[in-house]
């Protein structure tokens, strides 16, 4: 009898302990659910090379603790890979232009640099790149300074030359140092394709200020044909931040050299706007890479792009830059309203001029985004 009572008591104690654990789990879930309600979710979208991942890194630098030494060092192979990839694109591009261009002679690499060029092109085509040594950096610098390579670089928009090319080529000595640790600028310029989903949580006014919203920012990678698989997972996000590289109106895609990048951006923006899961979602459009755009538009007319074929230049210099930018901005505004259902026209839509590499501008822009979304929340709560 005593044994039975003892067992019964143990079972009751076990049940009580289990019930207490269940209650604690439920309490934590409830607390986390409440906490989640106060987090505004933002989704970063954009076509390849739009600069959205650079925006993501800027947010980490601006509103979090930035990159620690281990994270900075993890970018060493990325930076070195960018260097090798860049010099290969330029070398191979010069050979192609030397064979096919009308004025082909200026794209012929000098005899003394041809062997160096072949060697570096072979390295750039590998799956695994060697660490950048002083010797290799000197050879890359020699080839970079070759007149044919400089002529080729001037036509970089035709050859998939990355935006980071000039920056890394001008810093080869530092990048090849045996004790090299990437700077935050190196990390911002470094180009690596986003795969999967990465996220960070931040507040533009600091975590300790009660008035500040807390945001969770998602950067999503993936090929064009994979978008339909994951887009619905972000139903209910507070806002979509769509990055459009306005400087790329004369360039083609990496994955499809017959497809203009601006046309790809137009089609992606239109597709995202029409998604049912974003019917009540705010849209923040970042017209990115303005720093490149303002230089390019004075030399390459906007109307080389099919979408901008009705563009007519009106002036030169700063006035022409402003005119061209306003034209592009209006095109995106028209596309937004054409692609937005009548019952969704009251959702928030804002356009911001952006340069992802300009930290002060990114900080200012995100303060404006924060202010816009906080006002929307107050309005929906009936407090405005």
Curated annotation (Swiss-Prot):
Lipid-anchored residues (N-myristoyl glycine): 2
A Pfam family reported for this protein in Swiss-Prot or TrEMBL: G-alpha
Region (G3 motif) location: 215-224
CDD domains the UniProt entry points to: G-alpha (cd00066)
GO terms, molecular function: G protein-coupled receptor binding; G-protein beta/gamma-subunit complex binding; GTP binding; GTPase activity; metal ion binding
Keyword hit for NAD: no
Keyword terms, alphabetized: GTP-binding, Hydrolase, Lipoprotein, Magnesium, Metal-binding, Myristate, Nucleotide-binding, Palmitate, Transducer
Residues given in the record as GTP binding sites: 49-54, 163, 188-189, 194, 222, 288-289, 291, 356
One GO CC term on file: heterotrimeric G-protein complex
G-alpha domain mapped to chain residues: 38-384
Region listing for G4 motif, in residue ranges: 284-291
One GO term (biological process): adenylate cyclase-modulating G protein-coupled receptor signaling pathway
UniProt-annotated stretches for the region G1 motif: 41-54
Highest taxon, organism lineage: Eukaryota
Reported cofactor(s): Mg(2+)
Region (G2 motif) location: 186-194
Region of interest called G5 motif, as start-end residue ranges on this chain: 354-359
PROSITE patterns according to UniProt: G_ALPHA (PS51882)
Lipid attachment in record (S-palmitoyl cysteine): 5
Main function: Guanine nucleotide-binding proteins (G proteins) are involved as modulators or transducers in various transmembrane signaling systems.
The record's note on its domains: The helical domain (69-189) is required for self-activation.
PANTHER family named among the record's database cross-references: GTP-BINDING PROTEIN ALPHA SUBUNIT, GUANINE NUCLEOTIDE-BINDING PROTEIN ALPHA-5 SUBUNIT
Similarity-based family: Belongs to the G-alpha family.
Assembly notes: G proteins are composed of 3 units; alpha, beta and gamma. The alpha chain contains the guanine nucleotide binding site.
The protein, known as: Guanine nucleotide-binding protein alpha-1 subunit
Source organism (scientific name): Glycine max
Organism ancestry: Eukaryota, Viridiplantae, Streptophyta, Embryophyta, Tracheophyta
């Amino acid at each position: 009898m005593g044994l039975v009572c003892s067992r019964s008591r143990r079972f009751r104690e076990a049940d009580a302990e289990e019930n207490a654990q269940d209650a604690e789990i439920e309490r934590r879930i409830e607390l986390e659910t409440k906490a989640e309600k106060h987090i505004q979710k933002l989704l970063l979208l954009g076509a390849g090379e739009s600069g959205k991942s650079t925006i993501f890194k800027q947010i980490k630098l601006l509103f979090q603790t930035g990159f620690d030494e281990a994270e900075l060092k993890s970018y060493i192979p990325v930076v070195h890979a960018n260097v090798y990839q860049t010099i290969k694109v330029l070398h191979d591009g010069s050979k192609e232009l030397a064979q096919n261009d009308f004025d082909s002679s200026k794209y012929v690499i000098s005899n003394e640099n041809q062997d160096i060029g072949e060697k570096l092109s072979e390295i750039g085509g590998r799956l695994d790149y060697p660490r950048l040594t002083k010797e290799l950096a000197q050879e890359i610098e020699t080839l970079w300074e070759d007149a044919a390579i400089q002529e080729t670089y001037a036509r970089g928009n035709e050859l998939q030359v990355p935006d980071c090319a000039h920056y890394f080529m001008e810093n080869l000595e530092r990048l090849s140092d045996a004790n090299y640790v990437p700077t935050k600028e190196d990390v911002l310029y470094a180009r690596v394709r986003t795969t999967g989903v990465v996220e960070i949580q931040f507040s533009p006014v600091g975590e300790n200020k009660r008035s500040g919203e807390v945001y969770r920012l998602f950067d999503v990678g993936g090929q064009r044909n994979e978008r339909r698989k994951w887009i619905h997972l972000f139903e209910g996000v507070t806002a979509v931040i769509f990055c459009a590289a306005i400087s790329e109106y004369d360039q083609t895609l990496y994955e499809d050299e017959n497809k203009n990048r601006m046309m790809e951006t137009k089609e992606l923006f239109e597709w995202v706007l029409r998604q049912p899961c974003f019917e009540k979602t705010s849209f923040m459009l970042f017209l990115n890479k303005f720093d490149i755009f303002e230089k390019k538009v004075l030399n390459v007319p906007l109307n080389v792009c099919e979408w901008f074929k009705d563009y007519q230049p009106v002036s030169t210099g700063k006035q022409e830059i402003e005119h061209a930018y306003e034209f592009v901005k209006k095109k995106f505004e028209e596309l937004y309203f054409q692609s937005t259902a009548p019952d969704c026209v009251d959702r928030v839509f804002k356009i911001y001029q952006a340069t992802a590499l300009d930290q002060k501008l990114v900080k200012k822009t995100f303060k404006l985004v924060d202010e816009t979304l906080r006002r929307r929340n107050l309005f929906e709560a009936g407090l405005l």
